[in-house]
Amino acid sequence: MTAAGDAVVHAPQCRFCAPHDSRTLNRVKPRRRARNKRALAAIGLAVALAVAVALAGLPLFVFPSIDEPREVDAIVVLGPPRDARIHAAQQLAAEGYSDTIVIAVDDYGIDAAINIDACPPDAAPDEAGLVTRCLIPEPFTTAGEAIMVERLAAAEGWESVMIVTNVTHISRARMIFTDCLGGGVLAVDDGAGIEDSNWAWMYAYQSAAFVKALVAPTC
């Protein structure tokens, strides 16, 4: 209330401001809520898919079916040819499961035959009659290894092989080798395990590689 004669002071009006319209604000709020709901739904769907993929991969990459060793024509060490994997193959040979070991090696770097103690200068049997052959698949991938072993099996008359690799690789390697060789494939774990810091990366890599192998078979 103002006294008689007092001047009424009005706040200056903004010449450049949009007029205040409650109806406009009422329309904006529902739109914003709708966008938020859609964003939350998309996030929820992405999380659900990630969980589903992770759960689906457990029996393939964390708890795969590992074959019981039995006598085969050759034991195949899949790359990279690390010491633990080679030693696992040598132990299987020492237990009488095969007299032939094939080690997949690269043509350069730390995985080249020249840098691997288990690779002999020739393929002559050792004192125990064990033949170790270090061969370069083209390309140096699981698919390349399967193609290489398929050709070896045809040339040597092999009917069975036992592949040695890490636990996350077993399911995919068995599938690819079985596709190429048509059967007679065993897959065993090298026993080396996976470091905790590498599990997420290995899981993602093997998942993508498994899907690729399903979509584009090797043989």
Tell what function each PLM region has.
Residues K29-I66:
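N-terminal type II signal-anchor transmembrane helix
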Residues A4-V9, I110-N115, P125-D126, A209-K212:
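Secretory-pathway extracellular proteins and peptide precursors enriched for disulfide-bonded cysteines
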Residues T2-K37:
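N-terminal Lys/Arg-rich, disordered targeting/topogenic segments
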Residues F61-Y203:
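A structural signal for short, hydrophobic/glycine-enriched beta-strand patches
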Residues P12-R15, D117, T132, P217:
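Secreted/extracellular small peptides and ectodomain modules produced from precursors
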Residues N198-C219:
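A transmembrane-helix-recognition feature enriched in membrane-embedded lipid enzymes
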Residues L58-V62, P81, A213, P217:
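Structural signal for membrane-spanning alpha-helices in multi-pass inner-membrane proteins
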Residues R32-R35, R82, A209:
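Short alpha-helical segments used as structural interaction elements across diverse proteins
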